[in-house]
Amino acid sequence: MNLNLILKSLEYSFIKENKKEIEKIEYDSRKVKEGDLFVCIEGYATDGHKYAKKAYDNGAKVIVCEKDLEDLSYYKDCTIIKVSDSRKALAIMSSNYYGNPSKHIKIIGITGTNGKTTSTFMMKAILEKAGYKVGLLGTIANYIGNKKIESHRTTPESLELQKLFKDMVDEKVDYCVMEVSSHSLYLDRVYGVEFKEAIFTNLTQDHLDFHKTFENYFNSKLILFKNAQNSVINIDDSYGEKVLKKALGNKITYGVEKNCDLKAENLHMHSRGVEFDTIFKNEKETIALNIPGKYNIYNALGSIGACLLEGIPLKTIKEALEDMPSVPGRCEIVTKNYNLGYDVIVDYAHTPDGLENILNTAREFTKGRLISVYGCGGDRDRTKRPIMGKVGSNLSDIAIITSDNPRTEDPKLIIKDVLEGIERDNYIVVEGRRDAIRKAMEIAKENDVIVVAGKGHEDYQILKDKTIHFDEREVIEELIKEI
């Protein structure tokens, strides 16, 4: 492809000029082949500028950098381009390379601490019911229509993201609904993407290992609402008003407690779902979701608001939500087809607010004791660990503290951090996660409910020196046969 086309709309200067055509773009020097363009990105673990020579040796004919490269004479017959921000440059060039695909599909972005995944699945169900072909990008998997593609992170890097958009355009997708993480906003992965709608679910503590302060975390989320045509905002959340003031374009507020444009009333909750009246202007529909929890009413409202802005009738929205299957690893009752006398629920809750939501939801339909099994991830926000300990212990009859994804940290030390927040004497420590689930199932009695929180849909566990297969749903079904 012609280099000038790739550089369109980008501010840059030539340090060395030679090559005018490139094969493809890469930011990983190991993937560079003859004729490629390599972008030097400064990361948190390493700096791509250190690998410029490696990329050149592998065949790079164009190198884009934001820092001065040493020993320019080394790069014979190579074009070197200087930019002020390599990440923004990667996003712009990736979009140009793939033909600016985000201009050819309607993109709906969902951000917030909790609820993003469920909301994207709700949106997909509604839009498909309305007759559209839909793509989905998120934590569990990526979808182009019915085609499922493995997902490696909530929001892909800009190069992979633009490729997915291009694939959607090629497959004649009408809408893409996507989870937009705070990392992706801060790191410019979605820079230049034209969002038709942006949904704000909520904001609670998470990712402070990365953002350092809560204000930084919030400001990263705000970026989405400054780049969207329309915004759909949870006004019941304490940060909703701030988002409302900063958001551009048309806005719809939603909630249960406060006055808002789109409201849920007459809430009825039970073990297999929730029912509520949805009121928007002069319309009202009673909607019955087959997933429990008040927080899922909020997820539904955000999705409803965005779809109303897209002109989809409330009746169609109701039909789609009522027909929607459960989302993997989100309040998933693994034992519903077994007659055990107790239930085991798997949920992705890995933040204090997420854990509080799932335990409060489970408490609503627990006739016996509520038993929680959870831990905290290694190499992540340490400040939330004692809070997680306190929340889990206070809201459970029995809390079993265990490992999550310890990564490079010692699981015992992570558990120690969790225990610092526990004020009650109702906990057990079982370091091995499978053993912890077994313990919960062994002590469960008639009418008890076990909530296994933290991993949800994940089918792996990240240890210090390896990643192992670990699907809690499989583990639970195996233990049913063993116990």
Swiss-Prot record:
Amino acids binding UDP-N-acetyl-alpha-D-muramoyl-L-alanyl-D-glutamate: 29, 154-155, 181, 189
Q: How is it modified after translation?
A: Carboxylation is probably crucial for Mg(2+) binding and, consequently, for the gamma-phosphate positioning of ATP.
- Source superkingdom: Bacteria
Q: Name one Pfam family in it.
A: Mur_ligase
* Residues spanned by motif Meso-diaminopimelate recognition motif: 404-407
Binding locations of meso-2,6-diaminopimelate: 380, 404-407, 454, 458
Name the EC number(s): 6.3.2.13
Sorted alphabetically, the keyword list is: ATP-binding, Cell cycle, Cell division, Cell shape, Cell wall biogenesis/degradation, Cytoplasm, Ligase, Magnesium, Nucleotide-binding, Peptidoglycan synthesis
Named in its record, the pathway it takes part in is: Cell wall biogenesis; peptidoglycan biosynthesis
Q: Where are the transmembrane segments?
A: none
Q: Which cellular component terms (GO) are annotated to the entry?
A: cytoplasm
> Would you kindly state one Gene Ontology biological process term found in this protein's UniProt entry?
cell wall organization
The residues the record assigns to binding ATP are: 112-118
Residues where N6-carboxylysine is found: 221
Annotated GO molecular function terms are: ATP binding; magnesium ion binding; UDP-N-acetylmuramoylalanyl-D-glutamate-2,6-diaminopimelate ligase activity
Provide the primary localization: cytoplasm
Q: Which cofactor does it need?
A: Mg(2+)
Catalyzed chemical reaction(s): UDP-N-acetyl-alpha-D-muramoyl-L-alanyl-D-glutamate + meso-2,6-diaminopimelate + ATP = UDP-N-acetyl-alpha-D-muramoyl-L-alanyl-gamma-D-glutamyl-meso-2,6-diaminopimelate + ADP + phosphate + H(+)
Q: What class of enzyme is it?
A: ligase
Where is the protein found, in the record's own terms?
A: Cytoplasm
Q: What does this protein do?
A: Catalyzes the addition of meso-diaminopimelic acid to the nucleotide precursor UDP-N-acetylmuramoyl-L-alanyl-D-glutamate (UMAG) in the biosynthesis of bacterial cell-wall peptidoglycan.
Q: Which family does it belong to?
A: Belongs to the MurCDEF family. MurE subfamily.
Name this protein carries in UniProt: UDP-N-acetylmuramoyl-L-alanyl-D-glutamate--2,6-diaminopimelate ligase
The record lists the organism as: Clostridium botulinum (strain Hall / ATCC 3502 / NCTC 13319 / Type A)
Q: What is the organism lineage in this UniProt record? A: Bacteria, Bacillati, Bacillota, Clostridia, Eubacteriales
* Chain's gene name: murE
